[in-house]
């Protein structure tokens, strides 16, 4: 029952996910599908989910910070790593977690930035965090807005 429902859900989401993939080169299918699934879950049950983005600007520690951010991922999170010439971006979907989980994630990130890179604030490490809640807004629009805020897409 559960596996069949999950499979049927995936089949329904594929066309919508393909549109997200066409509009966002490099976006993993798993990321797009999970975002759409969580949008539906929120619409049907009101359960929150969140997305965070860490934009790591060019600095001598940029590659090390990005690598550590990837290592710090939680097991259930789904991520999209974007590598650009002047910055790296780690976008993380936090399924079924709202504001409190985002706050905890950002505090943990700030703590390891301080411990490992001696950066007391995000801006000391040239890291800019962005967050978004999965809500009534269509998943594609939510992602587009987040990418615009991260300066990946033009508004």
What feature does the model see in each segment?
Residues 2, 6, 37, 65-68, ...:
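Long, highly charged amphipathic alpha-helices
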Residues 22-41, 61-66, 101, 105:
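Interdomain coupling helix/linker and adjacent catalytic-core signature
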Residues 50, 80-96, 118-150:
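A short glycine-enriched loop-to-beta-strand structural element that forms part of the catalytic core
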């Amino acid at each position: 029952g559960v596996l069949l429902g999950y499979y049927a859900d995936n089949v329904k989401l594929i066309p919508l996910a393909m549109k997200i993939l066409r509009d966002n080169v490099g976006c993993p299918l798993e990321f797009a599908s999970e975002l759409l699934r969580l949008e539906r879950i929120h619409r049907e049950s009101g359960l929150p989910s969140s997305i965070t983005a860490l934009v790591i600007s060019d600095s001598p520690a940029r590659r090390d910070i990005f690598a550590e951010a990837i290592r710090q991922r939680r097991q259930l999170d789904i991520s999209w790593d974007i590598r650009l010439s002047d910055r790296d971006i780690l976008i993380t979907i936090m399924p079924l977690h709202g504001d409190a989980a985002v706050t905890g994630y950002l505090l943990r990130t700030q703590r390891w930035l301080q411990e490992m890179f001696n950066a007391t604030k995000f801006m000391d490490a040239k890291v800019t965090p962005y967050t978004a809640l999965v809500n009534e807004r269509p998943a594609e629009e939510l992602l587009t807005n987040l990418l615009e805020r991260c300066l990946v897409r033009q508004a």
